Amino acid sequence: MHERTFHIMTFGCQMNVNDSDWLARALEARGFTQVPEHEAAIYIINTCSVRDKPEQKVYSLLGRIRRETKNRRNVTVCVGGCVAQQIGKGFFKRFSQVRLVFGTDGAASAPQAIERLVQEPHARISLLDFSEEFPERDAGWENGEVPVSAYVNIMQGCNNFCAYCIVPYTRGRQKSRSSAAVLDECRTLVGNGAREITLLGQNVNSYGLDPHGDGTTFARLLHDVAAIPGLERLRFMTPHPKDIAGEVIEAFGALKNLCPRVHLPLQSGSDRVLKAMGRKYDMARYMDIVTRLKAVRPDIQITSDLIVGFPGETEADFEQTLEAMRTVPFVQSFSFIYSDRPGTRAEMLPGKLSREEKTARLVRLQEVQNEYSEAALQAMVGKTVMVLFESPSPKSAAGSGTDAQNAAEESGRTASSWQGRDEHGFILNVHLPAPADLYGKIMPVTVTAARKHSLTGEPAGESC
């Protein structure tokens, strides 16, 4: 087994996924090779601690790696991300194979640290300090292929300190990236083939409002990125309802390439619970944002995050959340059972609900959401939409017995079934009359059927 082989396992949000993708490029630029898990000498686990469940999965994974590699020499485990920031050097005591822990700001220095681990077999390194400014790093796109749909970090950390949330403690205080650096990376991506960019941050609407900002507001940044020649689609995540400015709402009507889909976390439909959460908005404010968004872009689709079982949540509070879901409604929501996070205000609140009660409420909430998600997909049938293709369709979507996957495997990207998304973010699978390479192409597609989580369609014109 070659000592310069690695495998990355990622938990959590899109920012973690983006960090892992960057780390892979940076290591490959240093001569490391990414391989399947069982072939790797270096295991890198990028962790999430926003809820208890993904954190426990990390400990379970570390235990499995320890068992499965106990007879292998020179196995190195690196733990990064939010759990690493939270637990720190405690990983060294519990897991002998862990030789590097790096926090969210420390990720920028992880490639150099991993290089050192190869050269110094007994070294153990921790990178846990928060930087004063945004931890800028070489994007490394010259070392690999640019994705057709790319993600760009515009900030790090959060200043909101919602009662349930550990992010300000694990990702630090908000640090805005300079607009020049953001625009430079976006131009590089588009110049090398990206057709869609998603701007990432814990609270994108407060971009530029911290001491590290350069005077550029988020609305201004949206306009500047949208103006890059060749950029077909622009998205962003995640905004906070308390900070969304009128100029950002107006951008959905002014910018043709700003996609009509916004993720707007509600968390609860109860004003009483929202206040206890420290969200700093109420349902009236939230619905005003929704109304204004729909006024400037009538076809806009809204998704959300919802927490059930927050301490003290009553049945009446929960019913208000269900009513909010029916009023908006959300085309999709990510719903979670509340879990205590160490050091947060909510951890100390009275009125904790039983696991059984929280689970029952989650089931009810998801039943309501499934109804609206299915209705949104059914409403697309018969419409013609522009689809940006990102990959051959998986077998489950292309249909059993199709040659999509086989063709893709035999000839790279040539396949007769392709998967992509329309501007609203709906996933579409399209079967072609003959194998073709549609990666990065945009094609008009007529939707013919709705599945549980996606759509199927047929070509309605030529790709471009």
Swiss-Prot record:
Organism: Oleidesulfovibrio alaskensis (strain ATCC BAA-1058 / DSM 17464 / G20) (Desulfovibrio alaskensis)
Keyword Ribonucleoprotein: no
Protein's name in the database: tRNA-2-methylthio-N(6)-dimethylallyladenosine synthase
Domain Radical SAM core: 144-375
Main function: Catalyzes the methylthiolation of N6-(dimethylallyl)adenosine (i(6)A), leading to the formation of 2-methylthio-N6-(dimethylallyl)adenosine (ms(2)i(6)A) at position 37 in tRNAs that read codons beginning with uridine.
EC number annotated for this UniProt entry: 2.8.4.3
Record bears the keyword ATP-binding: no
Annotated region (Disordered), positions in chain: 393-420
Family from the record: Belongs to the methylthiotransferase family. MiaB subfamily.
